[in-house]
Each structure stands twice: as structure tokens, then as C-alpha cells.
């Protein structure tokens, strides 16, 4: 599972997910990518499930880059506990994803294999996604 090695503070505010992604909106390493269409928290378990789905379908061919990292802790109080008495215990880690962010990239496989692998990965994620591929001049073309 992905998680930070150490953090300065164990608990964080939830924060807002306004606007579009500032960086990471273009394909940097691979040939094909999976782009978020909405804002969401993505847990380290969801990232791992998507990675496994992609690599299983590609059968050890190609390379996968994970472009998001769960660096934000989220907390939860136990069941049937009254309100108050402090913030809950850290429960897990999430990556904050905004619209336009490229979450995964793939290289070394055909477009059909990449499209299906990224479709399987998108089913594991709580956010609507779009398949994008790199253009010759370095950007990406948005194809569905």
C-alpha cells in the first residue's frame, strides 16, 4: 500500500476540492493515460486495486506509472460513539484528485490493450475517468 514514510502532523483538515488540477494534466512518461473528470478522494486501497487490475490484464507487458500519491490522512471515529471528545483516529490515506489530473500512464502495449486495461482500472475508482493518448507534439489527444 502507498503511504507517506512520515508526516509532520497525524491529523489534517478535510479541505476543499475546488477548481481544476494545476499540474499533472498532460501525459509525461507513457503513451496512454487515465484522466479524472471530477474531483474526489482516492484511497491507497483503490489505487492498489486499479494498479493490480491493469497489470493483470497486461500480463507483465508494458510499464505502468502511478501519477498520484495518497499523502493526506483521513480520520474516523468508532461506531456508536457520541459527538465531541476530539477528532477521530487516523483511518487511512487518500490522494486528492481534481478534474484534469492524469492518474495512471501506460507504455509498451498496443492501444487496444491499454484502453481495456485503463477501463478496468477506472471501474475500481470512485471518479469518472477518460482515456487519453499522447500526441506527437508532446500533449495528449482526448479520445473516448
UniProtKB/Swiss-Prot annotation:
Disulfide links within the chain: none
Alphabetized InterPro entries for the sequence: Ribosomal_uL16, Ribosomal_uL16_bact-type, Ribosomal_uL16_CS, Ribosomal_uL16_dom, Ribosomal_uL16_sf
UniProt GO MF annotations: rRNA binding; structural constituent of ribosome; tRNA binding
GO BP, sorted A to Z: translation
Swiss-Prot/TrEMBL keywords: Ribonucleoprotein, Ribosomal protein, RNA-binding, rRNA-binding, tRNA-binding
Keyword RNA-binding set for record: yes
PROSITE patterns: RIBOSOMAL_L16_1, RIBOSOMAL_L16_2
Keyword Translocase: no
Cellular component, GO annotation: cytosolic large ribosomal subunit
General function of this protein: Binds 23S rRNA and is also seen to make contacts with the A and possibly P site tRNAs.
Homology family: Belongs to the universal ribosomal protein uL16 family.
NCBIfam families with a match to the protein in the record: rplP_bact
Subunit structure: Part of the 50S ribosomal subunit.
Record-given protein name: Large ribosomal subunit protein uL16
Organism: Bacillus cereus (strain ATCC 14579 / DSM 31 / CCUG 7414 / JCM 2152 / NBRC 15305 / NCIMB 9373 / NCTC 2599 / NRRL B-3711)
